[in-house]
């Protein structure tokens, strides 16, 4: 359900604005998107796992808040994020 340290490092490297960037909204959205995809796959086999489903909803809410922040600051970055991570809006 969680992502490995190696996979997380790959996601960070692929979305960082500069070297050592781990806290920008783009990186945070990328990490959350990766975790959401993993949890979604988990629910295909564990349909009654409501405890984890609540965690998924919290992740989606956090990602939504970050996306709203990026949209408020820079519309072009927001659209690029949606397209890069296949997020429906």
Curated annotation (Swiss-Prot):
Keyword RNA-binding appears in the UniProt entry: yes
Query: What would be one Pfam family of this protein?
Result: Ribosomal_S15
Q: Care to name a GO molecular-function term for this sequence? A: rRNA binding
The record's listing under CDD domains reads: Ribosomal_S15p_S13e
Q: Which GO terms describe its biological process?
A: translation
Gene Ontology cellular component list: cytosolic small ribosomal subunit
Q: Where is this region: Disordered?
A: 1-24
Chain intervals with Basic and acidic residues compositional bias: 1-10
Keywords for this entry? Ribonucleoprotein, Ribosomal protein, RNA-binding, rRNA-binding
Per its UniProt record, what InterPro entries does this chain match? Answer: Ribosomal_uS15, Ribosomal_uS15_bac-type, uS15_NS1_RNA-bd_sf
Q: Which family does it belong to?
A: Belongs to the universal ribosomal protein uS15 family.
Check the record and name the PANTHER family matching this protein: RIBOSOMAL PROTEIN S15, BACTERIAL AND ORGANELLAR, SMALL RIBOSOMAL SUBUNIT PROTEIN US15M
Functional summary from the UniProt entry:
One of the primary rRNA binding proteins, it binds directly to 16S rRNA where it helps nucleate assembly of the platform of the 30S subunit by binding and bridging several RNA helices of the 16S rRNA. Forms an intersubunit bridge (bridge B4) with the 23S rRNA of the 50S subunit in the ribosome.
Subunit-structure text: Part of the 30S ribosomal subunit. Forms a bridge to the 50S subunit in the 70S ribosome, contacting the 23S rRNA.
Q: Which HAMAP family match?
A: Ribosomal_uS15_B
- Record's protein name: Small ribosomal subunit protein uS15
> What organism does this protein naturally occur in?
Rhodopseudomonas palustris (strain BisB5)
Q: Which gene encodes it?
A: rpsO
